[in-house]
Amino acid sequence: MTTIYVVDAFTTKPNTGNRAGVVLDADHLTTQEMQDIAAFAGYSETAFVLSPKDQSHDIHVRYFTPTHEVPICGHATIATHFLRATTGHQSDYPLIAKTGAGHLPVSIFGSSKELLVKMTQGRVEFLSPFNESQRTELASALGVSESDFADLPIQVVTTGHSKVMVPMLSRNKLDELI
């Protein structure tokens, strides 16, 4: 039987923050089984903890959305190491976590009541800003006007898992997108 833990990252209050699924012992699972579990769990990402395959890392973590595997997930990484530290599955920090985005250092600070998990992400990379045609297409896809965008570049930024950064003029317009 596989246990899926539900962990709220970036918060000290239950049922707030950014929720992730975490499976602490995934060595027996196939890639398809991990994908099926992530789809069943339904969280934006579910992390699967695997034993290290060599001495280049202390832990191997794979991340799945309900539809596909992704190289890294910040909040699921924080959730995974918080859970491991508070359930006795890991006490030796810092450590090196192998992910699809590379080998990342993870540290734990504080006491059991107020743990702080620190992960060092990969080097940030900024891709070319969107051109006018791409900005128009994005505004249409989001259901907003181009005038809702701040006068800053819209571009893909990555530290291992690419995201489109869309600066909005208004917090209200941003909230309407959710």
Where are these regions (language model features)?
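Active-site proximal loop and beta-alpha junction motif in alpha/beta enzyme cores
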Residues: M1-I72, I78-I178
